[in-house]
Amino acid sequence: MLDTLLINIGQLLTMDQEDGLLRREAMNTLPVIENGAVGIENGVVTFVGTAEEAKGLQAKEVIDCDGKMVSPGLVDPHTHLVFGGSRENEIALKLQGVPYLEILEQGGGILSTVNATKQASKEELVQKAKFHLDRMLSFGVTTVEAKSGYGLDDETEWKQLEATAQLQKEHSIDLVSTFLGAHAVPKEYKGRSKEFLQWMLDLLPEMKEKQLAEFVDIFCETGVFSVEESKEFLLKAKELGFDVKIHADEIDPLGGAEAAAEIGAASADHLVGASDKGIEMLANSNTVATLLPGTTFYLNKESFARGRKMIDEGVAVALATDFNPGSCPTENIQLIMSIAMLKLKMTPEEVWNAVTVNSSYAINRGDVAGKIRVGRKADLVLWDAYNYAYVPYHYGVSHVNTVWKNGNIAYTRGEQSWSTATI
């Protein structure tokens, strides 16, 4: 007997069309079962099909979804989850046109977050991050990548990674930990970036032994770390057994996209300034392009990543919030879906694949997350919508009704008035 059987699902988005990264037309294809049903037993999906096919199945609990839509739990593959403080005091300065470097000189910017993170205890960081994870869950996210990077010293970086490890044990969301010690060059290492990177590399063996990080990341940008420094750093991290990511070409076409493809990074993230050559190299690689349009939006920039061109040329594109206190303070992945549709010219189908299948591969979870398939853990979302296009269309709010994590209800909004949109 099943533990739970979901029936009368108007649209069941299984996302289960093929294994591996989705590109081109596959990104614009959604496997949808009309009038679907899903069976769950011991936290695992044991049945996926139509309501007609589900007849005769018995379950301890039968949930009538009343024609609403069900999808896999969403995957957010790029966040800066663990940090201290906030930076709302900088908004007025930005609106006045105060340059970021001047804000830094006043103790603001990333330095403000670094100082707040250093001053916070691990438990304070954990409790703050739990609040943000709860919000992510309420938006339908069940798997999250979490970066360090607000320490710029060994003690605080360890504290962030240990906080992430504790959160993995205490929160229902699955976390994937990334070491981003190379987020910026500390003042004391100004002009000595290679020495700083060596210091960060020296931390990796113990980090690997304690299993505190799965990925290593670096911020490759003008005035931070060069392409050659980034490649050398990440290749050494790979030699130590880590998978790697790269903050690439966020502002300038520095060659970060090319570097990511060349070294076989799991993902290249941002890519607003990615060159045509970089896009071509990504298309011919297994590196996921993780685009962060919420950051461009919040920074009030006019130029967004060329998501349409990337998809048309065969790049596997994912979407993420880039949740962080400075350049994208939002946990709302649904808002990111809407911005991607409007500003990156992605179709609703492409947007859904970018927050499920491709985003799972960006963090090496393609075999466990992002799809509804028999044998996989039951991470499911019941939406207050009748069709998938309605979610990114009706922007700025959450359409989530209920979230199941490993077959258990992890979030429910309860009885609400909801859309009567039809296809």
UniProtKB/Swiss-Prot annotation:
Its cofactor is Zn(2+); Fe(3+). Binds 1 zinc or iron ion per subunit. One of its GO terms (molecular function) is imidazolonepropionase activity. Signal peptide: none annotated. 4-imidazolone-5-propanoate binds at residues 87, 150, 183, 250, 327. Fe(3+) binds at residues 78, 80, 247, 322. It is an enzyme of class 3 (hydrolase). GO terms for biological process: L-histidine catabolic process to glutamate and formamide; L-histidine catabolic process to glutamate and formate. Gene3D superfamilies: Metal-dependent hydrolases, Urease, subunit C, domain 1. Its EC number is 3.5.2.7. PANTHER family: IMIDAZOLONEPROPIONASE (PTHR42752), IMIDAZOLONEPROPIONASE-RELATED (PTHR42752:SF1). Catalyzes the hydrolytic cleavage of the carbon-nitrogen bond in imidazolone-5-propanoate to yield N-formimidoyl-L-glutamate. It is the third step in the universal histidine degradation pathway. This is Imidazolonepropionase. It comes from Bacillus mycoides (strain KBAB4). The gene is hutI.
